[in-house]
Amino acid sequence: MKNYLSIILITCSTTFLLSQTRFSNQDVFEIQYVKDPQIAPNNSQIVYVRTSMDIMTDSKTSSLWKISGDGTEHQKLTSSTANESSPRWSPDGKKIAFVSSTDDENGSEIYIYWVESKQYSSISQLKQSPKNIRWSPDGKYIGFTMFVEDDVLKLVSPPQKPDNATWAPAPRITDRLKHEADGSGYMEKGFHHLFMISSEGGTPIQVSSESYNHQSFDWSKDSKKMIFTSNYSENWEYEFRNSEIYSIKVDGSDLKQLTDRNGPDRGPVVSPDGRTIAYLGYLDKVQTYQVTKLYMMNIDGSNKREIKTNLDRSISSLRWAPDGKGVYFKYDNHGNGKIGYTSLSGKTKKIADNLGGTSIGRPYGGGSYSMSKTGKIVYTLSTPYHPADIGIFDGRKVQRITNLNFDLLSNRDLGTVEDIWYTSSVDGRKIQGWIAKPPEFDKNKKYPLIVENHGGPISNYGDRFSPEILLYSASD
């Protein structure tokens, strides 16, 4: 009986290997991946954005899903078919705020999902789509940024257009230096402002009023102020790298500038005790690439200091440790996304590898993570052989709890991706690269070679899942 069983197992295994096919462009429409995983304050559940491809519209779709920390109870959060994003747990863990698209073109609203009743409802009626939603510490408000249009410039008054007439589009007139952008085209005239809305619903309140773009922000511990990034310089259009950190009361008063130097100061996060602001930045030396460093200051802007991590890598996405004794962050090292931690004295350590998998196409970096009140971390975990799934770090080890593409990728031979280093013939510098070998690679055969040069560390490539690279290596 044992011999028969062995024959059956070997036969099944061989059949499985033979049934694997190469990755194709049609497979791109079957890919799904995790974005923006958010763990509940008490570790009970994780909510994340599940991104899929719609072959009928040639576009991406996104919906919210929830899963327990052990990988069970994996199910869609709502019954909506709209695009959903930006899930954020309330401080008490009883609600989830999120953004959902509406019937209006490119429009979206803020929704609340009540965890106990499993009901959800829109709480806003906004003129534009909200971004960067964030709960106030007392749970009473949700802060966000939103674009506010300026009046359209007019050089002349056009003649009266007859009813049902078909005329050419009106001319676009701008007085802005930056009026177009790659990927988005013409930019409407206006600025992004800070807003807040009651978590019970109501009229949104515009907090900022200055005619500048307001970006990343955090709340003060008492929920009475917003700490945010902007550039209030008269020459803000020409100082495209420069930004400062400001504070403002939620009623729009008591605006204060907390930083003042030539360079970007951004990404403020307030410590658990409310006394310290951690932020990112560097002194601009007008170079193509400059290392983004970690800084801290008192809540009033005093006692600014750099936390010297000796990492020699740019960092991003700061998160305070629950005990306030250190800060977590993202960084890239040799083409691999990492989560790191530093104490307030600058003692740094790596927490997790393989952060990324959310930039489907080329092997760019990216990814995100979140943390519970007990310090458990969830993040987008990826390798060259699968896009982002959910990884959990419990303080000891990393565990992958989803496998969204098992049905597809287990039946595909993706070849192999290997790290290579070589020496520059110009200056002897060590240069890193990766070679993607085709399925069923035979070292005794010759293959055509595609070389794609790409710089770093700006938008670096790495050992990440990339349909573009897979399709190259799978081609005959």
Q: Where on the chain are the PLM-derived regions?
A:
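Short loop/turn segments that connect beta-strands within beta-propeller blades
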Residues: S68-T72, W114-K118, S198-G202, K249-S253, ...
